[in-house]
Amino acid sequence: MHVKKYLLKGLHRLQKGPGYTYKELLVWYCDNTNTHGPKRIICEGPKKKAMWFVLTLLFTSLVCWQWGLFIKTYLNWEVSVSLSIGFKTMDFPAVTICNASPFQYSKVQHLLKDLDELMEAVLGRILGPELSQVNDTRALNLSIWHHTPLVFINEQNPHHPVVLDLFEDNFNGSASNSPAPGRPCSAHRCKVAMRLCSHNGTTCTFRNFSSATQAVTEWYTLQATNIFAQVPNQELVAMGYPAERLILACLFGAEPCNYRNFTPIFHPDYGNCYIFNWGMTEKALPSANPGTEFGLKLILDMGQEDYVPFLTSTAGARLMLHEQRSYPFIKEEGIYAMAGMETSIGVLVDKLQRKGEPYSQCTKNGSDVPIQNLYSNYNTTYSIQACIRSCFQEHMIRECGCGHYLYPLPHKRKYCNNQEFPDWAHCYSALRISLAQRETCIYACKESCNDTQYKMTISMAVWPSEASEDWIFHVLSQERDQSSNITLSRKGIVKLNIYFQEFNYRTIEESAANNIVWLLSNLGGQFGFWMGGSVLCLIEFGEIIIDFVWITIIKLVALAKSVRQKRAQARYEGPPPTVAELVEAHTNFGFQPDLATPGPDVEAYPHEQNPPIPGTPPPNYDSLRLQPLDVIESDSEGDAI
Amino acid sequence: MAPGEKIKAKIKKNLPVTGPQAPNIKELMQWYCLNTNTHGCRRIVVSRGRLRRLLWILFTLTAVALIFWQCALLISSFYTVSVSIKVHFQKLDFPAVTICNINPYKYSAVRHLLADLEQETRAALKTLYGFSEITSRKRREAQSWSSVRKGTDPKFLNLAPLMAFEKGDTGKARDFFTGRKRKVNARIIHKASDVMHIHNSKEVVGFQLCSNDTSDCAVYTFSSGVNAIQEWYKLHYMNIMAQVSQEKKINMSYSADELLVTCFFDGVSCDARNFTLFHHPMYGNCYTFNNRQNETILSTSMGGSEFGLQVILYINEEEYNPFLVSSTGAKVIIHRQDEYPFVEDVGTEIETAMATSIGMHLTESFKLSDPYSQCTEDWSDVQITNIYNATYSLQICLHSCFQAKMVENCGCAQYSQPLPRGADYCNYQQHPNWMYCYYQLHQAFVREELGCQSVCKEACSFKEWTLTTSLAQWPSEVSEKWLLSILTWDQSQQIKKKLNKTDLAKLLIFYKDLNQRSIMENPANSIEQLLSNIGGQLGLWMSCSVVCVIEIIEVFFIDSLSIIARHQWHKAKGWWARRRAPACPEAPRAPQGRDNPSLDIDDDLPTFTSALSLPPAPGSQVPGTPPPRYNTLRLERAFSSQLTDTQTTFPH
């Protein structure tokens, strides 16, 4: 009951608006509002009134339009960037070092023996007897060969290309213009291609090459991949270059370091790689000064004479700078360091920090990417390179049933090899050039929000100099092999200096271009500019609208009431008596109202009026005013109940 | 009545013309100050005391001044830009890659053209430095240059004699060819000494260039004979080559099959057909990969060296021109497809017997053109004709400008740049003194006297590939043997000899990752932002708005002007009336106030009666009853509609 009472009271309060008609309300609003235009509408002459009315409308619509623009701009989630450049103490980048050759030839020779003999025979067949030194009388293991053979394609007659197996002298195609056996073809007549077959040789494709060099290199790499995929990981690591053989000297700042400061990681392309300052187990090392003296100095031995001859033709060290706890994609982003040279690398850390959703489509840690990160086995952070490679491996497993040797394996899967998956090479080469696969991966993977690049300034000089060569090699050989003879050579030795430049960071940081403060101040500015308004004006306007609604309700109720009353009671017909009439009726007895009109008025309140007493003070006319309202009030109460 | 007039009359009736309410300026001002929406003015009128009023006037004026100042700042900084840097990971278009051999033409092919020049160069070397036999390590096949034309007149040394100047005595010079000392009456221009002050401690070497009549000569000296002889040789070389036709030159240079031994892009084999020929005057035949042949631009969707371009180049050092080029290798330019490769200006040199791996990062930049900065989208707003078949760049514009000036001043075009329409390359036969003219012009160009630097604007958008170059030994020791033999087999059609590793260079060009950075300039301000900033300023200082501005215009211009006009009109009318009728009868004074003794009108608030301005009660008063105290009847507005009724009933 109490609640109802308060509700009613509140309703009554609300009803007491600034007027009882629309016009009054509007006039009151225009007169009292703080916005600048409306006031002028009511206090001017008719011409200016019209002008001000139009102006006010115009300004209102302008404000609305501009507000719309601002809100739209705000919802675009634009960013502004701030750039800072300077020097500060920073964590030294993680440095990954690999040898260009993945394995020591002396240790993998037993695995590659058959393949190498075959390769030499292939070269012999291509080059012809006078150019090749090998005599192909040895028994060759042709099982590898028959799986994916290299063929000559004689395209002299473009409509009937002649396909000729390198080791067969009979022809698969038409027998026209056959070259002499033993010297099958020369370069300008034939192209070397690789035959890739699937499904037990039912469908075959030829992978064409414009030069024989590419053909034999690709063929060898494919075969070697097949062989290494079957070897367990521990053996592969043992066949690679051990850290103590690779890293001869290490100096970080003034502190000496050695191969134990490097974390080993096995890379399928480059064998054993070693990462300095990876920050996986201990804290990352900072560098507080620019310049060579405060950076990392390394002397490496590549051992070029022990390279796998057909697998890698480029000699040197491969190195890469990357962030702590990130996987080194050294094949993509690494650089070479040349043997017999001192390579100095000045580093500038180029960092880009982005805001995530809704400003840009980047991911903080890769958790919202629909692809399983296969590199998470290494405990590394998310990167888009990792995502794309994981995506490729996923496709590979789906299409070919086995994982590619170059990428990590998901749980319970196997690397591809010829024995278990005979048509994998065919499947892989189709997938590799498939653009659809790449585009799906690019689409599925998101960039990470923090992107760090290491800008390098590379310079080189000959090292060691001729004068110092002798003693340096003596010392290094003594240290590594405890031998008094020189076991190193200029062809394998690499010196590296990695250091921060004078300006070591450049950070580009995103921040929201349009924040809520910006939006409000611009909205306020626009409203103020056109109309001199503020939030309070908006509240005023809202109040007026509430009043408006109330007046409408009141009017509607009154209308309904009057219609009902008209039907029920005839005496409520007609307008209520005017004050003047009532005044006359109560005060002046000598004065008789006009008999023609007042009929209903006189009869209107017969039971309420006492018989006129002379000298009575005039009634409190103010109370009379409430008469029509009383009716309504009771009605609205009825409505409320 | 005409309908037009009818409407006019109607408008007049409905919207009567009324002037400003205030009768004079002072009242108008007062009215304005009291009623305006701006905050300061009201305080001026309302506050009491002279000091306060003065203070408020001061404050208001300061606020107005501040508004003007701030708004001026806002407007003047309207055309500023904000820079945004965005990174996209996406499939990237591979750039066009132009590969040139550093040596332009096979020496064996051009030798017949350059025989005279070579002989004279050797002769000059002999006279000054005292050695004659230059034996190339590589070139042993032809030493037949020696004494074939001993008796012929040296034409090149006569045209531009090489000389050595002794220290401190620039007037005397020793002629290279004759060895005689002779007097030189010419301006001595020390090449490079304009920018670097070199103290010539030893003999300097230079050559003399004369205009048509030999009186006006200039001598260009160099600190080292190497530079002097190379420069001198190059001048004559250009002279000779300018007279050779383009087809002949293309034939003398390297073919694509010769230069490119193998090619591999994105895991797929490619060959010479994927390269387009581009003939450069100073570098001979260059080949451009991915130059929008077949209207498709190759793109990369994986980063890393195996998905980029891998080529092995054949660089035959035996065919090198000993005087023109002194380094061995190839030049690589990475550029946009529609861009002209400036081989001589930019480019990375690659070495033989090495694998050069070039990792790229793509950065795109967009600038806003006029009125934000002085950059240009295309040729439309640069008054230079494009002589290159490529899109706009600053370099193209500068070169075009120089070439145009060259044609204008010297009458012929410089050899290392394309030919403008209707001009010829410079050579001795037609333009005997072009070298002098060229040097003069070039010096003026370097000193920015030609106006090219001010005419040419930078381009608004450009792509930039940041390169990370690293070298490795290639082929490795153990793979050298088989690799070279199979490469020899591959090239057996073009080259008949066995390849050496110093004849080959491997080049890898690839995207390190597919991150593309775009640096974009955006307008920092928009119109709406400017307006809202101005609005903020107006609101902050004075709570003013456009409405106030309109008010000010209305009050200070229209109303006050009309008041003044009316005032003047009245004055003029009064003056006219006084002149016409100096004695005008005074109009009877209008009755003031109501003659109702019983009714006292309150000053402060209007009563019912006063509000109605009732006429005085009629003389016949009703006796007995006092008039009602109408004050009590002061009605509120709600009753105003009923007043007419009261009025009608009252007189009874």
From Swiss-Prot, chain A:
Catalytic activity as recorded in UniProt: Na(+)(in) = Na(+)(out)
Domain of life: Eukaryota
InterPro entries linked to this entry: ENaC, ENaC_chordates, ENaC_CS
Main location: membrane
Membrane topology: Multi-pass membrane protein
Glycosylation sites per record: N141, N379
Function summary: This is one of the three pore-forming subunits of the heterotrimeric epithelial sodium channel (ENaC), a critical regulator of sodium balance and fluid homeostasis. ENaC operates in epithelial tissues, where it mediates the electrodiffusion of sodium ions from extracellular fluid through the apical membrane of cells, with water following osmotically. It plays a key role in maintaining sodium homeostasis through electrogenic sodium reabsorption in the kidneys. Additionally, ENaC is essential for airway surface liquid homeostasis, which is crucial for proper mucus clearance.
Disordered: annotated span: 597-624
Bias kind Pro residues: ranges: 609-620
Regulation (activators, inhibitors): Originally identified and characterized by its inhibition by the diuretic drug amiloride.
The protein's name in its UniProt record: Epithelial sodium channel subunit beta
One GO biological process term: sodium ion transmembrane transport
Organism: Bos taurus (Bovine)
Extracellular side: 72-533
Pfam families: ASC (PF00858)
Disulfide partners: C98-C273, C185-C190, C197-C204, C250-C257, C362-C449, C387-C445, C391-C441, C400-C427, C402-C416
Family from the record: Belongs to the amiloride-sensitive sodium channel (TC 1.A.6) family. SCNN1B subfamily.
Modified residues (Phosphoserine): S634, S636
Segments passing through the bilayer: 51-71, 534-554
Cellular compartments per GO CC: apical plasma membrane; cytoplasmic vesicle membrane; plasma membrane; sodium channel complex
GO MF annotations in UniProt: ligand-gated sodium channel activity
Keywords tagged on the record: Cell membrane, Cytoplasmic vesicle, Disulfide bond, Glycoprotein, Ion channel, Ion transport, Membrane, Phosphoprotein, Sodium, Sodium channel, Sodium transport, Transmembrane, Transmembrane helix, Transport, Ubl conjugation
Keyword Ubl conjugation: yes
PTM annotation: Ubiquitinated. Can be ubiquitinated at multiple sites and undergo monoubiquitination and polyubiquitination. Ubiquitination by NEDD4 or NEDD4L inhibits the ENaC channel through endocytosis, intracellular retention and degradation of its individual subunits. However, some studies could not confirm the ubiquitination of this subunit of the ENaC.
Motif PY motif mapped to chain: 617-621
Gene3D superfamilies linked to this entry: Acid-sensing ion channels like domains, YojJ-like
UniProtKB/Swiss-Prot annotation, chain B:
InterPro entries: ENaC (IPR001873), ENaC_chordates (IPR004724), ENaC_CS (IPR020903)
A cellular-component GO term for this protein: plasma membrane
Record text on activity regulation: Originally identified and characterized by its inhibition by the diuretic drug amiloride.
Cystine connections: C100-C286, C210-C217, C263-C270, C375-C460, C397-C456, C401-C452, C410-C437, C412-C426
Residue ranges annotated as motif PY motif: 626-630
Gene Ontology MF: a single term: ligand-gated sodium channel activity
Processing and modification events after translation: Phosphorylated on serine and threonine residues. Aldosterone and insulin increase the basal level of phosphorylation.
Job of this protein: This is one of the three pore-forming subunits of the heterotrimeric epithelial sodium channel (ENaC), a critical regulator of sodium balance and fluid homeostasis. ENaC operates in epithelial tissues, where it mediates the electrodiffusion of sodium ions from extracellular fluid through the apical membrane of cells, with water following osmotically. It plays a key role in maintaining sodium homeostasis through electrogenic sodium reabsorption in the kidneys. Additionally, ENaC is essential for airway surface liquid homeostasis, which is crucial for proper mucus clearance.
Stated name of the protein: Epithelial sodium channel subunit gamma
Gene label: SCNN1G
